[in-house]
């Protein structure tokens, strides 16, 4: 049961899906799309970035805010990166493979391609691109998908280069890795047709399914990211970036709606109180020269403790806007953009070693009354000033309502401030890459892949897989291998579709859950495994043990692993003699239990021959001997 009636609230939401493509080369250079270990980096360099004017003489507001603090950006480079990633050389032509994949995706979304594709530069000054901009190209528009809530428009599909990956922050420096920079990705933007949290998840799941249907997208953490645009009636558009887990999308939408409703409540309360924000910044450093608060002692040492007066804000700064987050948290997020650790406000004081007497001293110094609040920042003078100015601006926005902004998704479903929404000044033409013609003939030559949903139904109807297994295989990373193996063993007596599927999506995950790294298993390992089963060299009961051994020692061949585990072909006469001997020894037990003795005795036989002889063969041989023994009795 949903907490809110989203249609009554006027919820409008849209998604932007960013998916890395699994092309051989990067988008504007011929470097491989390999993800490297940071320890493999063999050199590094650094940059300082600043906001520049667009062709119209304007500066993007998000870029201006991000460059208020001078940050050093350090880039880790590899033997698989080149001068283009370093921004020391112009880009090459756009990757044809990436373009073909993207056009195939556009067909699955019923989109119309542009006649001529132009590459643009999108200003990005958070350090994630060495050049200070990201290259992007608008490829297709006017698409749609059908959902349980009706048709959802797909407004645009762009081809972009991936950003560098942030490794760590060290003071005023941020370290990035260049292995990811330039990997091709598609950005798919829906229309604001999403009407509820569940609908948002449904749309995201469908888009993800379409992308995986290509077989040409990267998989794993960080290879796909969802951004969510949300607004409600009387609110403003807020963009939430970096939702990596599909399970989080519903919570993100619910909690953003809750945040906006609470901000509107705070706004109404502030208006009724006739609240306002004082422009003056107060230096209260002298009031804390003898403070016992360790946090403020550091502020005194750094040189500055500044305060701002919020008239009629008392008890509203501590008002919760999302679970565990308050209006004061929103103020703190803004302060942190200046490089400070956070702030203090009256709704949480006295605390942190700050006494009631010290709180009153600040109130007296700045003229705060019982209905007022104040915020306080302690840091180096310039950082503290920028931080308190940011808080003053955010407090003013609280009186106006909901600010348009870009926020980042947090692991618990909440969000935190990142930067203002970018404006039109963010984008300008890329002059180093020529336009690309998309002719009707070229577009018609692109054949869209079969959707995974259709493929799963085909596996169920044609290959005899049950629905659950068919869906698991269709959506798994082993889909291409499954289809190869299925074709190889179509008429094999010992290897069928169910065995192949259970191995790939049942046994392999089980091995992984046991703590063994299964990424070491190659297609050749699986091909060798099923060849051995087909040739009756091993039984299917040996699959888990054999794959575990290969995962631990991937340099082994299947035959070498079989020998090492002692899983050689069985001698039927030897097995028959073993079973006859056991039946004679367990004669009294068989006389007592009759045919039901089969189960317990089967355990003894399997313990001896598991992985060497197929269980069905052993069961048949044992039953035959038990029946003979009972018949002779």
Curated annotation (Swiss-Prot):
It is an enzyme of class 6 (ligase). It comes from the Archaea. It comes from Methanosarcina acetivorans (strain ATCC 35395 / DSM 2834 / JCM 12185 / C2A). Heterodimer of GatD and GatE. SMART domains: GatB_Yqey (SM00845). This is Glutamyl-tRNA(Gln) amidotransferase subunit E. It catalyses: L-glutamyl-tRNA(Gln) + L-glutamine + ATP + H2O = L-glutaminyl-tRNA(Gln) + L-glutamate + ADP + phosphate + H(+). Allows the formation of correctly charged Gln-tRNA(Gln) through the transamidation of misacylated Glu-tRNA(Gln) in organisms which lack glutaminyl-tRNA synthetase. The reaction takes place in the presence of glutamine and ATP through an activated gamma-phospho-Glu-tRNA(Gln). The GatDE system is specific for glutamate and does not act on aspartate. Signal peptide: none annotated.
